[in-house]
Design a protein with these regions (language model features):
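Blade-level signature of beta-propeller repeat domains, shared across WD40, Kelch, NHL, RCC1
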Residues: 311-373
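Short glycine/acidic-enriched loop and turn motifs that connect beta-strands
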Residues: 27-31, 76, 115-116, 171-174, ...
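Repeated scaffold domains used in trafficking and secretory/extracellular systems
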Residues: 5-11, 52-66, 89-106, 134-162, ...
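Beta-propeller blade signature
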Residues: 35-42, 119, 179-194, 235-239, ...
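Noncatalytic modules at the cell exterior or secretory-pathway interfaces
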Residues: 438-455
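Beta-propeller domains
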Residues: 18-55, 72-86, 120-124, 130-132, ...
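Loop/turn-rich, solvent-exposed surfaces of beta-rich toroidal or solenoidal domains
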Residues: 223-225, 233, 246-292, 386-389
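Entry beta-strands of beta-propeller and related beta-repeat scaffolds
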Residues: 19-22, 65-70, 103-109, 159-167, ...
Length: 566
């Protein structure tokens, strides 16, 4: 899937009316773009719908009463008829769709990434504005109010228990690209009128419940919201009108950033198995469909991944992941040791078709999370619960800044039923490292202090066993190793619909049918300019050396490499 924008992410992937429907998005396009609505047949024929108007959409919901799919600005019935709400009538980057609080049989809500909120009549597609979209727009004359909700870069939207829940995961400001501890994001509610009401000032993404893409069937059903801060992932549970926090470890820190730009749209979705599948910070999560305050056990990592996933669904026996693969614009990815012209010439992304069992066979799960991170604590303070189960190996580090030893009490919720018992007590002078035994079990762990504590940190390191063996998988057979005698080298670059390669002075192109042809020399310059500069990476007899921001970093180097060889 291609567009003419700086990025081509996958906003939504939904099986509907015997087909798979997919939308892509460009970066910050509140009034439309070159992106498309795709209809994919069971035989994997890709149909680009002529109704496409693009934008930056990632919202999707199946409206049961009218038997329609809302995906982006499009409404699709069972006969695959597509109707469109133009951005002139509903401006903004559509990020979430939810069931209506007052008239769910005939209306739904659509929220935007700049905190806008609309009601849409599913029959005539008329629109009513409740909260104005934050993008400048002098032409649109809606009746909504201007929000005062902090944060920006909206993500999830869901309704239940008489409330609409909205999440954003970003912040504006000069520090957001450098300091991940910057206060950022918001989890908010709306009760049918007025402005968003702040629930928690952290970065949040997915908001959903047991009803998934259809919305909750019972208005008493819970809502789950997934987010993070500098310490860990954050899972919020709304049950019986009250919020309950939980913390999970991060599988990767690559998705961090107070700006919120690195996550795309994490999801918790049904995939035809007992448990739901969650994606967040590089981990595939097993998420119990009946997760609640008294039934919170069972969240567990399945594996770690390196993709950036926007949405996914089960279709024709496989899990289809819509990814954000190759952007023409480099955004924040500017480094002195990489080419300034190495990005693909045209943004593109693909669908990743995966057998369900493969999800458990990817990268070994790792997790890192804190309940306190250089925090000053009050006497009697109790941490939020942190995941304690699901990993083969678990370790905890405690540090504090008091002059005298501090007592930390560990409490465990063994069954996930909300009943806490003391697991162990530690007297910590300055720091402590504790490796948990296999006999120390439970769903959740929390800590308690009896006195004031300065600069307290409690951090968890988790990992699974790596069962992959020492050898590389067969997918790497075509890559030259240190001992390969017959090899070739060159520079490759994504060049619109082909892969271009410059090797040995000759220029080649590889198409989507894996046909390699020698091309005209005119394409060689495009590839050559993408070559990696050598000025910031060097080697000596001890190691490889990378220079960045005035500092030098040494990286281990195999002794088989000759430091004098290029």
């Amino acid at each position: 899937m291609y567009n003419e924008e700086g990025e081509c992410g996958t906003g939504a992937v939904v099986p509907w009316a015997g087909r798979l429907w997919v939308i892509t998005y460009g970066p910050h396009k509140p009034m439309g773009s070159s992106d498309k609505l795709y209809e994919i047949t069971p035989g994997l024929k890709q149909i680009i719908r002529p109704e496409s108007i693009g934008g930056t959409p990632a919202n999707r919901m199946i409206h049961k009463e009218s038997n329609q799919l809302n995906i982006g600005p499009y409404f699709i019935d069972q006969k695959r008829k597509v109707r469109v709400i133009p951005y002139a009538s509903m401006p903004g980057r559509h990020t979430g769709t939810a069931r209506h609080l007052k008239d769910p049989a005939n209306k739904l809500y659509v929220a935007t990434m700049e905190e806008g909120l609309y009601s849409v009549d599913v029959h005539d597609l008329s629109v009513v504005e409740h909260v104005k979209d934050g993008n400048p727009n002098k032409k649109y004359r809606g009746q909504g109010i201007k929000t005062k909700l902090p944060g920006y870069h909206g993500k999830g939207l869901y309704s239940s228990q008489g409330t609409l829940v909205y999440a954003n995961n970003g912040e504006r400001g000069k520090n957001v690209t450098k300091d991940p501890t910057t206060t950022s994001g918001a989890l908010a509610t709306w009760q049918g009128s007025g402005d968003w009401k702040l629930v928690r000032r952290n970065q949040f993404t997915e908001v959903t419940g047991p009803g998934g893409i259809y919305g909750n069937a019972d208005d008493k059903d819970p809502i789950w919201a997934m987010g993070w801060d500098a310490r860990s992932l954050i899972l919020m549970l709304l049950e019986n009108g009250k919020w309950h926090p939980y913390r999970l470890p991060k599988g990767s820190h690559s998705y961090d950033g107070a700006h919120g730009w690195n996550t795309e749209w994490p999801r918790i979705r049904e995939i035809g198995q007992k448990d739901l599948l969650g994606t967040m910070h590089g981990t595939f999560w097993r998420f119990p469909e009946a997760f609640s305050k008294t039934n919170s056990a069972g969240i567990a990592p399945r594996s770690n991944y390196l993709k950036v996933i926007g949405d996914f669904a089960r279709w024709k026996g496989r899990i289809v992941f819509g990814c954000d693969d190759s952007a023409q614009k480099e955004f924040l990815n500017h480094r002195p040791f990489k080419s300034t012209k190495g990005a693909p010439l045209q943004s593109n992304s693909n669908l990743w078709f995966v057998e369900a069992e493969k999800i458990d066979q990817l990268g070994p799960a790792i997790g890192r999370g804190s309940v306190w991170l250089r925090d000053d604590l009050e006497a009697g303070q109790v941490s939020e619960p942190h995941l304690f189960s699901g990993y083969d190996h678990r370790m905890m580090v405690i540090r504090h800044g008091n002059r005298k030893p501090v007592a930390f009490t560990l409490e465990v919720d063994k069954k996930g039923d909300g009943k806490w018992k003391v697991l162990q007590k530690f007297k910590v002078e300055n720091s402590l490292v504790h490796i948990f035994r296999d006999t120390e079990k439970g769903a959740w762990l929390r800590l308690r202090v009896a006195e004031k504590v300065k600069q307290a940190t409690v951090h968890f390191h988790y990992r699974d066993k790596d069962l992959r063996g020492k050898g590389n998988g067969p997918i790497f057979d075509g890559v030259a190793t240190l001992g390969t005698k017959a090899s070739s080298k060159g520079v490759i670059r994504s060049n619109r619909k082909v892969l271009s390669m410059l090797a040995g002075g000759a220029y080649y192109e590889l198409n989507d049918r894996l046909e390699l042809t020698r091309g005209a020399k005119s394409g060689a310059a495009l590839v050559a300019e993408g070559a990696q500069p050598k000025t910031k990476i060097r080697v000596d007899t001890a190691s490889a050396i990378v220079e960045e921001d005035g500092s030098s970093y040494r990286i281990p180097m195999s002794p088989g490499y000759d430091a004098q060889d290029e």
